[in-house]
Amino acid sequence: MNDRNLTGKMKENYRFFGIGTALYAGFYTLCLYKNSGGIAFTFFIAGSLWFYCLCMKKLEVSLKKGSIFYLVTVMLLAVSTFITGDGRIIAMNKTGIFFLTASFLLHQFFEDKNWSFFKYMENIIKLPFVWIAKVHRPFVDFHKKENEKQDNNALYVVLGLLVGIPLLIVVWGLLCAADAAFARISRNIFGSLNFGSGFQIVFMVLAAFFVTYGIFAYLAERSLSDEAREKTPAEALPAIIVLIPLTVLYMVFCWIQIFCLFGGNFNMQGMTYAEYARRGFFDLLAVCILNLILVQAGYGFFKKNKVLDITMTVMSACTYIMIASSAFRMIQYVKHYNLTFLRVFVLWFLVVLTVLLTGVIISIFKRSFPLFRFSMVVVTVCYLLLSFAHVDYWIASYNLHRGETAGTASYHMGHTDYSYLRYMSSDAALAFREYIEDGGKEAASADEGVWYGEDGEREYFVLEEDWLTYYTKRMDTRYEKMGIRGFNLSQYIANKVLHGN
């Protein structure tokens, strides 16, 4: 269309956007009030995507090619949140949902084909805050059509919803205080209601309304440039001078890794495996982020130069060896100290980083390569595998069965860290049940804890109760507090498994 700005269409459909956003704000509060990962969260995400698509239909914004990927992956993450009890996975799922939803909206309203990696990230991070400059828009849009009867009615409906929903909650809280039976039923659905929770609900409704309306008002303006700005690239010589010494340093470092670490000529020199693995990983992460920035700057701000391209390629290739070095050290660490969620995440991240570096190298020689989209797809697909894997199940299964190999040279002192098992998520319950059925009842009653002293050596202590009893009590407490909106499939299965159902 010639007129890219859709603000006029949004104002013409104020009745829909005003009432629809108010209802959406109520739906948001109903689903997410004191509910972080239950079935209501999954319904909220599904409802949100439907509402966004409905808004775009009103603005005559057609679903673009590639948008299905965003819609499907967001829903998969929402389903994953419902079927896992791991708070770390749930938190990362929500982060992924935010980035994918923001990318979906930007992709729908703007021609983002020529956006650079940094421009995409800038717009995604900026999107949650654009509503601040549009907080007045609901009132302005109404005022423009104030003489039209239907728009007066629309405003009255919006005001009625914004006032009526909080008032309903306050009265509901009073009724809960007046009758124990009514309070118990309400608590199973919404949790405890009082004046404090009423204030919180009012805030959630108002915040959801103004944030959602403001974001769509911003998107409707289509104020972002569709094309990458034409800039005169700088001479490549300064970049070459900066990158060549770094590349030489990387090559020396990689040679040392190959000769000393992979060649078996390595001496820990007093460092524990924990210190060595953690230092190696986080240092590598910093170097890889730096490499990404340097490569982006190299082909984004400097003229194409053969020497520069080769230098950046060698620098990126050296990172492969750094990744292999980090993975080798982490695997040795796991052999001695078993698995934890962080150690699994480190290994997963190294695999993802290897694939991402391939995209970075391609982008050096093919400037038009869509690095952001490539990175988005790689990270999303790999993370979905991690999210649906129920990591705690595999960690618990591995650690418990490794305990049966106590005394082997590769297993540090032949001990299982039972204190770690006590605090695992509901995803681990099935592994515990399988282990006990395989004859591990003695280990299930172990009361041994472990911690690391200042010298890195393991020290042991006696727990007040065995780890399985403590874990079962934790799961029972969570199951009892779950409620209808917070119903979680993993918590439900854990309760049945632990009690032999």
Identify what each model region corresponds to.
Residues 1-55:
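N-terminal signal-anchor module of multipass membrane proteins
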Residues 2-15, 56-66, 112-119, 138-155, ...:
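Juxtamembrane membrane-water interface segments of multi-pass membrane proteins
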Residues 31-181, 204-205, 209-221:
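Transmembrane-helix bundle segments that line or gate the permeation/cavity pathway
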Residues 93-108, 195-223, 239, 246-251, ...:
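Terminal, non-globular segments
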Residues 189-204, 269-287, 339-350:
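Short aromatic-rich membrane-water interface segments that cap or initiate transmembrane helices
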Residues 369-392:
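Internal/C-terminal transmembrane anchor helices
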Residues 384-413:
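Hydrophobic alpha-helical transmembrane segments in integral membrane proteins
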Residues 419-501:
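Extracytosolic and intramembrane catalytic regions of membrane-associated proteins
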